[in-house]
Amino acid sequence: MFATAPTPASRRRRLASMLYEAVLLFGVGFVATLLFDLLIRAGGFPLLRQTWLFLAIGLYFLLNWYARGQTLAMKTWRLRLLDRHDRRPAPARLLLRYLLLWPLPLACAWLLHQVAQAGDWLALDLLIVATPLSLFIPTWFDPQGRFLHDRLVGTRLCVAP
């Protein structure tokens, strides 16, 4: 696919893309929640709403990764998602990547909440918004600097040509 081997994306570029992605996901989440509320027309279904939101965000990522190999934020920061053979990953691999990117930040959010509750430091719960940054911890231990979910699935983020 590339004349030369793709350049791995720097942590700085991935962080910038992630922050921009968070802004875009606010819009995706808003529209998904609005549609849910209009379709269901009843409150009291928080688990169903969270599932709907999880699916909407997943659809956003999967469609973009499959169609172009990148989301709008990734395109802005010139990032592309590739597999081991420098091609766009297969749909099953993309789905697995989406599912595996959640456990680490969710575990960190849960741990942070437990510490806040145990120490009666409720303001500490505000730091939960920073738990997606926990995705960067494994990059310091991977020889290629990949996220844990990318290492497990066999994908990587590279600088787009």
What are these regions (language model features)?
Residues 1-161:
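Membrane-interfacial and juxtamembrane segments of integral membrane proteins
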